[in-house]
Amino acid sequence: MAEAYLLDKLKSVEQTFQEMTRRLADPDIATNPDELQRVAKIRSSLEETVNTFNQWKEAQEELRGAKEILKESAGDPEMKEMAALEVEELENTIDTLENRLKILLLPKDPNDEKNIMLEIRAGTGGDEASIWAGDLLRMYSRYAEGQNWRVKLLSESAADMGGFKAVILEIQGEQVYSKLKYEAGVHRVQRVPVTEAGGRVHTSTATIAVMPEVDDVEVEIDPKDIEMTTARSGGAGGQNVNKVETAVDLFHKPTGIRVFCTEERSQLQNRERAMQILRAKLYEMELQRQQEEVSSMRKSQVGTGARSEKIRTYNYKDNRVTDHRLGQNFSLAPALEGDIEDMLQACISQDQQAQLEQLAAES
C-alpha cells in the first residue's frame, strides 16, 4: 500500500481492536453492562477492517513468495508461466483489498444507522407539481417495500387535482438514512400533464427533505417557543371527527416551522407526533448548516444535499432519469416503480471517492 498514512491508520485500528479484545476477556467487565456493551460495539465496528487488513498482509506475503519463484524459474518455462499467473492474481487481489480498506477507513456518518422522516413538498408547477409529489411518494414507498423497510404516513396535505401539496413519511429499517440521504434536494419532472390539452411539455418540481429521527436529548425545544392550536381532524375516526378536535397545529416561533398532524386518533398522540416531526426538522436544519460549512471547504461531487439543489430530472418523453450530481442517465420506467438502487449506489460510490480524495489531500 503506497500511502503510508493508510498503513498508520490500519495499525492504529489493529491496536485498538486488540485492546478491546483484551478488555472483553477481562472478567471484571461483566460487572459493568454499559461498559461491556460499549467495548463490544467498538470491537465489532473494527472487526471487518482488521480481518481485511490481515487478508492484505497474507496476500503480500504470498506475493513475495510468488515473485521469488518467478525469479528462480527462468529456466523452466512451464513453472515461469504458472508463477507469473499467480503473481498477477495476487496483485489483483491486493488491489481489491486495498480499495476495500480505504473505504472501511472513511469516517462513519453517525446518522447512517437511523430511521428517517422523508418530506415530499410540491414545488413550482401548480397542480402538476402536486401530482408529481404523489408520484414520488409512490416511488419511495415501492423502494422501501423492496428493502423490507416499514413506512408510515405521518402528515399529509392533499391537493385538489390529485397528489399532495406536502406529505411526510416515517421510514424505519436497516441503514435507511445511509441510502436515502442522497435523495434530498429538488426533483424536476418534464412531461405532458394530464390536464394539458395542447400536448405541451411542462416542467414541475418537488422538494425532498430527509430527516434522521432524533430523540429529546439530541434536540432541546423550549416550550415557550411553541404555539399549539387544535382543529377537527379530517381523517379516520367516524363521527368522532366532528365532535373532538384531535388535529394539532404546532408553530415554532424562532424558525417559523409549522407542523400540522392529523393522522393519529387522539390529540395527545398527534401532539407527540408533531413534536417528533419538529425535532427532526430542527435537527435537519442543523445538519444542513454543518454541511454548508464543510462544503465551503470541500466541494463534494455528490453535492450538499441542500433543499435548493436540483439533483435529478425525470424526462418522460425520452424515458430517462438524469442524475445531475453523477452526470449519468438511468431508465425512467423502472425508477418510478421504485428501482432506484443503482442510482443510490452510484451516489454512495462517488461520495466515498470524494472522501478518499479529501483524505489523501489532508495526509
UniProtKB/Swiss-Prot annotation:
The keyword Cytoplasm applies. GO terms for cellular component: cytoplasm. Methylated by PrmC. Methylation increases the termination efficiency of RF1. Pfam families: PCRF, RF-1. InterPro entries: PCRF, Pep_chain_release_fac_I, Pep_chain_release_fac_I_sf, Prokaryotic/Mito_RF, RF-1. Peptide chain release factor 1 directs the termination of translation in response to the peptide chain termination codons UAG and UAA. This is Peptide chain release factor 1. It comes from Picosynechococcus sp. (strain ATCC 27264 / PCC 7002 / PR-6). The lineage of its organism: Bacteria, Bacillati, Cyanobacteriota, Cyanophyceae, Oscillatoriophycideae.
